[in-house]
Regions:
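Residue-level signal for glycine
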Residues: 28, 73-75, 120
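Bacterial N-terminal signal peptides that target proteins for export
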Residues: 1-10
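N-terminal glycine/threonine-rich, aromatic-flanked beta-hairpin/loop signature
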Residues: 45-82
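N-terminal helix-cap/turn-to-beta initiation motif at the start of protein domains
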Residues: 21-35, 58-59, 131-132
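N-terminal Sec-dependent export signals
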Residues: 5, 24-26, 66
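Bacterial N-terminal signal peptides
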Residues: 10-18
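Beta-sheet ligand-binding and adhesion/scaffold domains
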Residues: 36-48, 53, 80-132
């Protein structure tokens, strides 16, 4: 009789816990190389289109780091995924005060938008595909 009661109790617990486990959101893995076209408007350079390459090299839970590849070299950044597991932000290591606001569109696609205010204002966005 005790075994039947124990089984019923365990089934009852599973009945209440299992639905929560199904709906728990998994933190997306952003590690990899991302590439795509960047479109931007700049006070100094006007409207510009260019290729954008981002490599995310490390991730622990929702925080990550990596670099953007420019013509002049690599620029390091650090970032964080918001608790909704869809939106993220990063700050680069340059002396400007620009920031990136991003959205995870799916496992293979992210959108990043860069904003920098001031005398040399820049606003631009990229749709980046994971290439490796």
């Amino acid at each position: 009789m005790k075994i039947k009661s124990l089984i019923k109790f365990l089934l009852l617990i599973l009945f209440f816990i299992f639905p929560y486990a199904l709906h728990a959101k998994k933190i997306p893995n952003l590690i990899g190389t991302w590439e795509g076209e960047n479109i931007k408007s700049s006070v100094k350079k006007g409207f510009v289109r260019s290729n954008n390459i981002v490599e995310i090299t490390e991730q622990k839970s929702r925080v990550f780091r990596g670099f953007v590849i420019h013509k002049s070299g690599k620029e390091k950044f650090v970032g964080v995924i918001k608790s909704n597991n869809k939106d993220f932000f990063w700050a680069d290591s340059s002396d400007d005060d620009g920031k990136v606001i991003g959205t995870i569109l799916n496992k293979e696609t992210i959108e990043t938008c860069y904003l920098d205010s001031g005398r040399d204002a820049v606003a631009g966005c990229s749709i980046l595909k994971k290439i490796k």
